[in-house]
């Protein structure tokens, strides 16, 4: 996780290329919210993979696909549509979902509905990497989690201060739920030296200068504002 411009998309692309180079037989999905990211992700993954192997990626095993998707395959492929097809649950297109659930978060609603209607979960991918996770509901991340083969490798990148919804992304304990004994299905363990980190914060921003960032935070959070004593204190 990190601010916009901290390199989250670059890290995801590099990780995808590395995993594909180490495990060429794995089925890997890279998904996102903004359609224009697809070309950028493909170019980055291709470049990083060639740097590591001097070969082109096997795009049959690396799927760069949109989150929603539609029938027809190819450019229309998507995570949600693949889940519905594999688990024999009803698929909703954008217009149908919006008409039924409104404009607030129709995609999150249909993801939750698909999860509740699926009798079993068919594993499809070995790894799923999600960019712009702050723009998705927890239901979509749970849907991705249920599409994974054991040991369920899910990587998601997000910016807590930049999202299309009014809510921030909950903790993994909330997103993925609990087991029957009450323990979390997913829990980020504290960092132990010599072991991979599970929660990584990208602290540098390469897109904006420090004065611009400090000014934006001061205005956005109202740091120097003096609210009225009888007011709410909110900006």
Q: Model segments located where?
A:
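Conserved helicase/translocase P-loop NTPase motor core
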Residues: 88-128, 135-150
């Amino acid at each position: 996780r990190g601010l916009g411009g901290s390199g989250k998309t670059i890290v995801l692309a590099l990780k995808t290329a590395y995993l594909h180079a180490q495990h060429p037989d794995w089925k890997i999905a890279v998904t996102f919210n903004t359609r224009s990211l697809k070309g950028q992700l493909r170019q980055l993954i291709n470049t990083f993979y060639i740097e590591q192997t001097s070969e082109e990626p096997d795009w049959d095993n690396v799927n760069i696909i949109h989150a929603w998707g539609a029938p027809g395959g190819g450019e229309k492929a998507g995570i949600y549509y693949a889940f519905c097809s594999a688990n024999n649950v009803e698929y909703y297109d954008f217009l149908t979902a919006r008409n039924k659930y409104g404009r607030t978060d129709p995609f999150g609603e249909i993801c939750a509905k698909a999860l509740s209607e699926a009798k079993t979960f068919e594993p499809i991918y070995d790894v799923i990497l999600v960019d712009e996770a702050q723009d998705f509901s927890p239901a979509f991340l749970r849907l991705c989690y249920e599409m994974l083969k054991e040991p369920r490798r899910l990587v998601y990148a997000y910016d807590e201060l930049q999202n299309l919804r009014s809510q921030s992304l909950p903790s993994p304990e909330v997103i993925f739920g609990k087991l029957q004994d009450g323990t979390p299905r997913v829990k980020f363990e504290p960092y132990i030296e010599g072991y991979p980190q599970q929660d990584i914060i990208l602290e540098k921003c390469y897109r904006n200068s420090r004065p611009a960032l400090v000014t934006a935070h001061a205005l956005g959070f109202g740091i120097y504002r003096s609210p009225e004593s009888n007011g709410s204190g909110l900006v």
